[in-house]
């Protein structure tokens, strides 16, 4: 380690501290302090101020209601969509539905196999008799 790095850091930090000390922040004032004294307002100015405040309040509430309605519309469209399921039961049901909807197309090309309740057991009994 050289002495150049700590000395440059020290010089930089002293410069920052000097600049920070010379800066002064302005005090924040609330919006109520900037308003003139309500007793000093004329009746016409008071009505105009009240009308402006009511208009701003109504506009803000209208925007909030519109946003809520948009969110509800997005939420209802999501619930209306069909959820996909990849479990064995769901896949089996989908395949059964596909076969039942296809109707005669699959049945006309279907070659029956010799499986069922009589396929294995009856032959053994018939052979023994």
Swiss-Prot record:
One Pfam family it belongs to: Calc_CGRP_IAPP
InterPro entries cross-referenced by the UniProt entry: Calcitonin-like, Calcitonin/adrenomedullin, Calcitonin_CS, Calcitonin_gene-rel_peptide, Calcitonin_peptide-like
Modified residues (Phenylalanine amide): 120
Chief subcellular location: secreted
Signal peptide start and end residues: 1-25
GO CC, one annotated term: extracellular space
UniProt propeptide residues: 26-81, 126-129
Subcellular localization, as worded in the UniProt entry: Secreted
Organism domain of life: Eukaryota
GO MF terms, alphabetically ordered: calcitonin receptor binding; hormone activity
Cystine residue pairs: 85-90
Keywords carried by this UniProt record: Amidation, Cleavage on pair of basic residues, Disulfide bond, Hormone, Secreted, Signal
Gene Ontology BP annotations: adenylate cyclase-activating G protein-coupled receptor signaling pathway; regulation of cytosolic calcium ion concentration
Its job: CALCB/CGRP2 is a peptide hormone that induces vasodilation mediated by the CALCRL-RAMP1 receptor complex. Dilates a variety of vessels including the coronary, cerebral and systemic vasculature. Its abundance in the CNS also points toward a neurotransmitter or neuromodulator role.
Protein family membership: Belongs to the calcitonin family.
Name of the protein in question: Calcitonin gene-related peptide 2
Organism: Equus caballus (Horse)
Gene name of the record: CALCB
């Amino acid at each position: 380690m050289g002495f150049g790095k700590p000395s440059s850091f020290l010089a930089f930090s002293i410069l920052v501290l000097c600049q920070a000390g010379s800066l002064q922040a302005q005090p924040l004032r609330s919006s109520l302090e900037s308003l003139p004294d309500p007793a000093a307002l004329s009746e016409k100015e008071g009505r105009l101020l009240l009308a402006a405040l009511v208009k701003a309040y109504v506009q803000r509430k209208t925007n909030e209601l519109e946003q809520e309605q948009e969110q509800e519309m997005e939420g209802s469209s999501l619930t209306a969509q069909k959820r996909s399921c990849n479990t064995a039961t769901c896949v089996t049901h989908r395949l059964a539905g596909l076969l039942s909807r296809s109707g005669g197309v699959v049945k006309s090309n279907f070659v029956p196999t010799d499986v069922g309740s009589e396929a294995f057991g009856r032959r053994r009994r018939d052979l023994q008799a």
